[in-house]
């Protein structure tokens, strides 16, 4: 879990646009966040396996 200060810092509009970054809305992780879901890869996988993300299913080929 990310520190609350870092989560609040990410919400602010930065002085320069390139400094903006996404954080996972569930755990606050800053790396590997899927913009479409707003979740990091770990939370995305957990919720997909539980069936809590509509339209997401496990790939098999």
UniProtKB/Swiss-Prot annotation:
* Cofactor(s) essential for the protein: Zn(2+)
| Entry GO terms, CC | cytoplasm; small ribosomal subunit
Where does this protein hold Zn(2+)? 24, 27, 40, 43
GO BP terms, alphabetized: translation
Per the entry, the cofactor note is: Binds 1 zinc ion per subunit.
User: Superkingdom, according to UniProt?
Assistant: Bacteria
Q: Name one Pfam family in it.
A: Ribosomal_S14
What does the record give under GO molecular function? rRNA binding; structural constituent of ribosome; zinc ion binding
**NCBIfam families the UniProt entry points to:** PRK08061.1
Oligomer and partners: Part of the 30S ribosomal subunit. Contacts proteins S3 and S10.
User: What is the recorded function of this protein according to its Swiss-Prot or TrEMBL entry?
Assistant: Binds 16S rRNA, required for the assembly of 30S particles and may also be responsible for determining the conformation of the 16S rRNA at the A site.
Give the family from UniProt.
Answer: Belongs to the universal ribosomal protein uS14 family. Zinc-binding uS14 subfamily.
Q: What is this protein called?
A: Small ribosomal subunit protein uS14
Q: What is the lineage of its organism?
A: Bacteria, Thermotogati, Deinococcota, Deinococci, Thermales
Supply the gene name: rpsZ
């Amino acid at each position: 879990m990310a520190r609350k200060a870092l989560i609040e810092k990410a919400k602010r509009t930065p002085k320069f646009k390139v400094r903006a970054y996404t954080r996972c809305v569930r755990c606050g992780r800053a790396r590997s966040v899927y913009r479409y879901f707003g979740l990091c890869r770990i939370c995305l996988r957990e919720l997909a396996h539980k069936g809590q993300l509509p339209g997401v299913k496990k790939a098999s080929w």
